[in-house]
From Swiss-Prot:
Annotated organism of origin: Salmonella typhimurium (strain LT2 / SGSC1412 / ATCC 700720)
NCBIfam families reported in the protein's UniProt record: PRK05416.1
Similarity comment: Belongs to the RapZ-like family. RapZ subfamily.
Keywords: ATP-binding, GTP-binding, Nucleotide-binding, RNA-binding
Statement: the UniProt record of this protein carries the keyword RNA-binding: yes
Signal sequence residues: none
Classification via InterPro entries: P-loop_NTPase, RapZ-like, RapZ-like_N, RapZ_C
Protein name as catalogued: RNase adapter protein RapZ
Residue ranges, annotated region (RNA-binding): 266-284
Binding site for ATP: 8-15
Gene: rapZ
Keyword Repressor recorded: no
Biological function: Modulates the synthesis of GlmS, by affecting the processing and stability of the regulatory small RNA GlmZ. When glucosamine-6-phosphate (GlcN6P) concentrations are high in the cell, RapZ binds GlmZ and targets it to cleavage by RNase E. Consequently, GlmZ is inactivated and unable to activate GlmS synthesis. Under low GlcN6P concentrations, RapZ is sequestered and inactivated by an other regulatory small RNA, GlmY, preventing GlmZ degradation and leading to synthesis of GlmS.
């Protein structure tokens, strides 16, 4: 059974995550004090029910040792997993402005910006030991729920899920990436007026990139690197591996490369997902 601990900065989507986990059959508790985690787990152990608990800055233990002690006292039937949700500072500020809610630390006479920064410092002990960090900056409520369903169901099946995501460096590097590869040195379809409106998912762009030897070499060497270390990653109690491929805008080269790598590992029987951050952002 799984004990999913959901944490993250306020406004990053913890309530959405908890609702998604409840839909997946988890017994969910919002803002349970850390010291009560072992008691909850023992209560649910006999019923064979996986649980999800949210922890935010209001019920953080006074010291990391208290959290470690609670984890050590969990029944052996439970496998604890820590999910940490985050978003960039500007996104969190915008979400608070849209909802007009008060930040949990606002009562300490802090501005919203200062409260967000302070919260980040207080939650760092949890973030540093998270099994999965999810950046929700560009996600809608439905996208976050769907992403959690695909990733966490894979985790419960103890199967490594390889996630290949494209992005644009001008929009920032994904904070949930395990590996980041820069493909800005490859030939750029952007400079062809006919290809500029298209994306790396379109056949003319794929044909353009497929004509270049350096593109083939990059794909071959990247997949060879991943194949070399994949067996160790699979035996290291991991459930996911996020590989981010970045070009300038996240529209052509990174999309094509991410899809090529995803197709290759999918053909090898791996559990593979692909997503394209810039293209998804353009849809919203």
């Amino acid at each position: 059974m799984v004990l999913m601990i959901v944490s993250g900065r306020s406004g990053s989507g913890k309530s959405v995550a908890l609702r998604a986990l409840e839909d997946m059959g988890f017994y969910c508790v919002d803002n349970l004090p850390v010291v009560l985690l072992p008691d909850l787990a023992r209560t649910l152990a006999d019923r064979q029910i996986s649980a999800a608990v949210s922890i935010d800055v209001r019920n953080m233990p006074e010291s990391p040792e208290i959290f470690e002690q609670a984890m050590n006292n969990l029944p052996g039937a439970f496998s604890p997993q820590l999910l940490f949700l985050d978003a960039d500072r500007n996104t969190l500020i915008r979400r608070y402005s849209d909802t007009r809610r008060l930040h949990p630390l606002s009562s300490k006479n802090l501005s919203l910006e200062s409260a967000i920064d302070k919260e980040s410092d207080l939650l760092e002990p949890l973030r540093s030991r998270a099994d999965l960090i999810v950046d929700t900056s560009e996600m809608s409520v439905h996208e976050l729920a769907e992403m959690l369903r695909t990733r966490l169901l894979g985790k419960r099946e103890r199967e490594l899920t390889m996630v290949f995501e494209s992005f644009g460096f001008k929009h920032g590097i994904p904070i949930d990436a395990d590996y980041v590869f820069d493909v800005r040195f490859l030939p750029n379809p952007h400079w062809d007026p006919k290809l500029r409106p298209m994306t790396g998912l379109d056949k003319p762009v794929a044909a353009f990139l497929d004509r270049h030897t350096e593109v083939h070499n990059f794909i071959y060497q990247t997949r060879s690197y991943l194949e070399l270390w994949l067996p160790m990653l699979e035996t290291n109690n991991r459930s996911y591996l996020t590989v981010a491929i970045g070009c300038t805008g996240g529209k052509h080269r990174s999309v094509y490369i991410a899809e090529q790598l995803a197709d290759y590992f999918r053909s090898r029987g791996k559990n593979v997902q692909s997503r394209h951050r810039t293209l998804e952002k353009r849809k919203t």
